[in-house]
Amino acid sequence: MSDTDADADTDAVSTTETSMNADANANADGDTLRTPIVAVLGHVDHGKTTLLDTVRGSAVSEDEAGAITQHIGATAVPLETVSEMAGELVDPADFDLPGLLFIDTPGHHSFTTLRSRGGALADIAVVVVDVNDGFQPQTIEALDILQRTGTPFVVAANKVDTTPGWTPTDGSPIQPTYESQPSAARDRLDERLYELIGDLSDEGFSGDLYWRVQNFTKNVGVVPLSAITSEGVPDLLAVLMGLSQRYMREQMAIDITGPGAGTILEVKDERGFGATVDVVLYDGSVRPDDIIVVGGTDGPIVTDVRALLQPRPNAEIRTENRFDRVEIAQAAAGVKIAAPDLDNAMAGAPLRVVRNRDRANVVSEVEAELADIAVETAEEGVVVKADTLGSLEAMANALKEADVPILRAEVGDVAPRDIAIASTANEERNQTVLGFSVDVLSNASDELEESNVRLFTDDVIYQLVDEYKSYVDEQERAQQETVLDKIVRPCRFRILEDHVFRQSSPAVVGVEVLSGTLKNNQYIIKWNGNEPARIGELSGIQEQGEDVSSARAGTRVSIAIDGPTVGRQIEEGDELWVELPEKHAKILEQELIDEIPADELEALTSYLDSHRKRDPFWGK
């Protein structure tokens, strides 16, 4: 993309020159305490978006001099505004951290997007849980990833205002509004909160209501609140500021003048700029004309920054003139970067500013981070697509735990090439594409209809893996049933007394099936000591005068046997067996033993025991 192209659409961006960061407090020695980065997670419809909107809306309504700044993919709330919203719960004099930066990633269903240098991009997280629903699949998935990355978190027990009998007090801290409620409402809420704390315990976390927690490094604080009425939101902000100040202050000390480091949240085409990346910057700074290195689908991309963009205040996202240019972005901040050659940049990948460093070293740094999350692949396996690099890593971990091999794994929507690759798998179970939080391109849908490839998509990783495993289990059962239909099944039966209807050509006798399954067109044997003697072939079965193809244990039927004569080779009262080919006996014992009924297993065991008395290795 040329310089001319980058500036072609003058309506798309304001020429206002400003700088942006989420406010920062400089120390006397020049070090700066950056804003802690907060991720808000939760199951669909549990209120995470409403909570973010409430934080934004409340902060805007305060109309303070240090009012919030809307970043790309993030919302910065300065300490003064936090104090106004939290009231007496937050005294600015007690804090030297500059505020909070809430990451806002609509469309991103997984916290896995938010990674940096092998850990979590967020310094602290809020897990939003509907007190009425408790933990749901995405809640559990979020907790699992938070645990893996070692990210501290609090639980926002949302929708307390839906408690029967609750009378809301908008914007109030939770304890005063709780105390003002009728006892029945308090009791009902207590019950729900203790159930939620029990859910935490079930997932391996010790938790309690936040004001009862003495040590937040060992226990998870639960903050009851309502994103709709803002009750308890002051408490949440106070807890986030308090935890950040007490436990993370040293981690927040950075040099904001140094070369920037960040994580790509999203790759988007913007009119007048082409492909752009939305980035959360967690260290240093970035300026127009900086050379940057970003992670791409084919390796690191080296390019130069043409423009830094932030949303215009109160601008509708659909309007053309919706961005302001900024002259510098400093951590912590969310910023849109316009630069050439970003089409293959990956969401979740690292971004580094070169500036006064050796370019080759920075490229190696990005390569190393990409290699750190490279997915282990096999010669035979499934195709995996995910929305971000972090999601891909989490998918690969989940599939590895489930012993599912991966042939190919990439970031991006499902494309025709993915269907073509999956169709080359030798095993039917591997002719599969697993897509996490991705769309299917229309031409890929067409190819899918014409192929034998199966596609599974979901926004919850473990549900996606479980769905695939269920499919494989069904396939295996179907294959086993097919094998069982084709294989000779063990059966022991006895000729009934006074039930000889014809002596020979064929012999027709009444029998009782003692164990196993009797089927037509199978050879029949009689044991003489340890020696099996084939006496004929079963050519017909009748039950109550009707022809049938098989008879199970416990039934009495009449059968026709070609070959023997009653009174010579067989007698009334004789015990006879279906002859099992040795190969079939081996398959039944080694592969299908869990699939056959108990009586059939009994017949198989007896049959094998008889053979192995004369040949210990028969059927092995």
Swiss-Prot record:
Q: Which UniProt keywords apply?
A: GTP-binding, Initiation factor, Nucleotide-binding, Protein biosynthesis
User: Looking at the record, which segments are called G1?
Assistant: 42-49
Biased composition annotated in UniProt, kind: Low complexity? 11-29
Query: Which residue stretches belong to region G2?
Result: 67-71
Limits of the tr-type G domain? 33-248
Q: Where does the record place the region G5? A: 226-228
Q: Where is the composition biased (Polar residues)?
A: 162-183
Annotated region described as G4, given as residue ranges: 158-161
| Matches recorded under Pfam families | GTP_EFTU, GTP_EFTU_D4, IF-2
Which amino acid positions bind GTP, per UniProt? 42-49, 104-108, 158-161
In residue numbers, the region (G3) covers: 104-107
Is Transcription regulation tagged as a keyword? no
Q: Where is the sequence biased in composition, kind Acidic residues? A: 1-10
Q: Got a GO cellular component term for this one?
A: cytoplasm
GO terms for MF? GTP binding; GTPase activity; translation initiation factor activity
Region of interest (Disordered), residue spans: 1-29, 162-185
Q: What does this protein do?
A: Function in general translation initiation by promoting the binding of the formylmethionine-tRNA to ribosomes. Seems to function along with eIF-2.
What family does this belong to? Belongs to the TRAFAC class translation factor GTPase superfamily. Classic translation factor GTPase family. IF-2 subfamily.
| Protein name as catalogued | Probable translation initiation factor IF-2
According to its UniProt entry, this protein's organism is Haloquadratum walsbyi (strain DSM 16790 / HBSQ001)
Q: Which gene encodes it?
A: infB
